[in-house]
Each structure stands twice: as C-alpha cells, then as structure tokens.
Amino acid sequence: MRGSSWTRAGALAAPLAASLLLAGWSHAAAAACQSRSGKALRPLVELYTAEGCNQCPAADAWLSASARRQPRISWLAFHVDYWDAVGWVDRYAAAAHGQRQQYRLQSLGRQALVTPQVIVGRDAPVDWRGAAMAQLLAESSRQVAPATLAMSASAQAGGRMRVDMQARLDGDRIAGPALLWLALYEDGLETAVAAGENAGRMLRHDRVVRKLAGPWKLE
C-alpha cells in the first residue's frame, strides 16, 4: 500500500506474544522489517474525523503537518461512519472507529461524541488548535515508556503479511486495564467529495487507519 505503516495504538502492557496474518496488503508494504520500542514514551494522538464533516478538513491538515514536524509521535486518523448518513459516505470510515471513540471517551469519563475530536494517550479530549496540545505532547514525550514492544513483519505468499508482536510490562507504571492494539495506516490519500457538507472539495489525508486489530487484554 502506498505510504503505509504499522503503529501501536492504545495502552500497552505484557507479557504478550501474538501473530497476525493479514490479507490484501501489497508485497511492498513489508517485505521484511523489525522494530523495537525505546525507553522514552511515544505519545499517541488520535484524531476522530469524517469526510462528511465540514470542520474536519482543517483538523486533517493539522494532523498531516504535525506528523511531518514531529515524527517521534504516533499520529492516527480514525474516520468514523456516523457521518455517512448525512450526504456523503466516507470510504475510509469504519464502525469500529466510532466504537473505539465511544470506548475511549467513556474510559475518560466523557460523553460528547463529536468530530473533529483529538485524544492524547489517557488524557481527556484536548483542543488541537490550542497551546495545551503542544504542552501535553512535550510533557508526555519526557515520560518513560511503561512497556517494551517488539514487532516484526514479513510478506507472505498470496499478498498476505505476517506480523509478530511481543510486549513486556516494565514495572507497574500502567494503572487500570492494559490493552494492546495494532493499527495499519496509510498516507497520501485523496478524495474528491461530491456531496454533503464538503461537496466540491478535494480532501487530502495522512495517517488514515485502514486496519485495526485487537484489543488484546493483558493480565
């Protein structure tokens, strides 16, 4: 897939060893690669967005620019499907993305399901346009990672990809339930929107989640 990559999403702990076989991804996506996490926490920024929402293109552009400026932060765009009934069907949307948004909000004691909405790690939704976002990311980046992750990916016959993961908890720095997710995202996507609030616009997207696997509950 053009510009595709894997990233870890969600709260992480261990021990865990898991393997996945994914169909339909191009051979170029992962001929053979390995990755291991470092000691510093890599903040996760989740943008919940939709092509049918006229306030979302600005947030999409912000995420694309931020991902280029700050590659040590994990940026993910989850396109939600609850806008699909309002004039335009988002081809990148999935019901699982809206369900994840709802779960994340409930775990943070919040209820407002809106787009665009940005959640950073275990913090409550934050205004992506404000100074609080930069401060939160800076503070998060100085923290020590609570888990060690190792991942390898290799191309398989028939256009399939094998992904192997191992996770190990380092100490007791994770409070509450620990879940492991795996997300495949794609960059450089474009859509000519023909209906709905963004009719007539060419929308450009990066870090779009195309496959979400998990969660694995870690005891």
Where are these regions (language model features)?
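N-terminal export leaders
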Residues: 1-12, 118
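Compositionally biased regions
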Residues: 5-6, 20, 27
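Bacterial N-terminal signal peptides
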Residues: 11-24
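Active-site-proximal cofactor/substrate-binding loop regions of enzyme domains
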Residues: 29-114
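Short, conserved sequence motifs used for protein processing/export or organelle targeting and
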Residues: 89-219
